[in-house]
Amino acid sequence: MFTIDFSDHTGLVKDAWYKQIEDLLEFAKKEEHIEDDAELSVTFVDKQEIQEINRTYRDKDKVTDVISFALEEDEPEIDFSGLDIPRVLGDIIICTDVAQEQANNYGHSFERELGFLALHGFLHLLGYDHMTEADEKEMFGRQDTILNAYGLTRG
């Protein structure tokens, strides 16, 4: 089982889009060979709220498109097999204002950009990062592979 708790603080995300994001992340979970039951949250916020979160928790006083808080970060890997509890991956926070701007810049739909950002945040929850050039190449390559296999491409 894969549980995703959605929360929209903006009122801009259509109910049907939750299903697309859920399907994409379920696909990504399989692609990443996560067989355990898992749980995460996806919250949609505006620029003001994401800047406040970024400032408070990351010491970066600026707006961004997506922030992820991995619950397993810097923790030893835990074997959940045999336990009747889900693996709690963490929280993904997406700024709908920035998502709309990026969708316009890339020439694709707002819905599609939300999918890209949700997957990007999901990969962060799994430990991918882009702090170095090598890490960026690995993460973005993985992101593109999953998006292409799922059929959600830019443009």
From Swiss-Prot:
PROSITE patterns, sorted: UPF0054
Enzyme Commission no: 3.1.-.-
MF GO annotations: metalloendopeptidase activity; RNA endonuclease activity; zinc ion binding
Manner of cofactor binding, per the entry note: Binds 1 zinc ion.
Annotated GO biological process: rRNA processing
Swiss-Prot/TrEMBL cofactor(s): Zn(2+)
Binding site for Zn(2+): H120, H124, H130
Localization per Swiss-Prot or TrEMBL: Cytoplasm
Short name of one Pfam family: YbeY
Keyword Hydrolase found: yes
Keywords: Cytoplasm, Endonuclease, Hydrolase, Metal-binding, Nuclease, Ribosome biogenesis, rRNA processing, Zinc
Similarity section: Belongs to the endoribonuclease YbeY family.
Function (record text): Single strand-specific metallo-endoribonuclease involved in late-stage 70S ribosome quality control and in maturation of the 3' terminus of the 16S rRNA.
Protein name as annotated: Endoribonuclease YbeY
Annotated organism of origin: Staphylococcus aureus (strain MSSA476)
Gene expressing this chain: ybeY
